[in-house]
Regions:
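A short, internal acetyl-CoA/4′-phosphopantetheine-binding micro-motif in the GNAT/acyltransferase core
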Residues: 40-47
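Conserved acetyl-CoA-binding loop-helix of GNAT-fold acetyltransferases
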Residues: 48-61
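A conserved beta-turn-beta hairpin within the catalytic core of GNAT-like acetyltransferases
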Residues: 29-37
Length: 93
């Protein structure tokens, strides 16, 4: 896969390679201006390249645009917010 082309559909951001999803992050509305990041998947051959962080940042960008707060249900998303203090303002309290 030469170029990361992050695509979107309702509830997810994803990367496809030859028509197959090789990386995806899913989120769902929780009501009252809150979304949860539910799951992150990166195919084994793409792990360790920062793709999961890119996908979390896509959800963060979406949350900022839509004025939403985030609940990081997915353990990877929780880890991301642990590392990136500046984005914690988006966490639902």
């Amino acid at each position: 896969m030469d170029k990361r082309n992050i695509q979107t559909k309702p509830g997810s951001f994803f990367i496809e390679d030859n028509g197959k999803t090789v990386a995806e992050i899913s989120y769902s509305p929780q009501g009252n201006g809150v979304i949860s990041i539910d799951h992150t998947y990166i195919s084994p051959g793409l792990r360790g390249q920062g793709i999961a962080d890119e996908l979390v940042r896509k959800v963060i960008g979406y949350a900022r645009e839509e004025d939403l707060k985030i609940i990081p249900v997915c353990s990877y998303a929780g880890h991301y917010f642990d590392k990136n203090v500046e984005d914690r303002v988006l966490l639902h309290k």
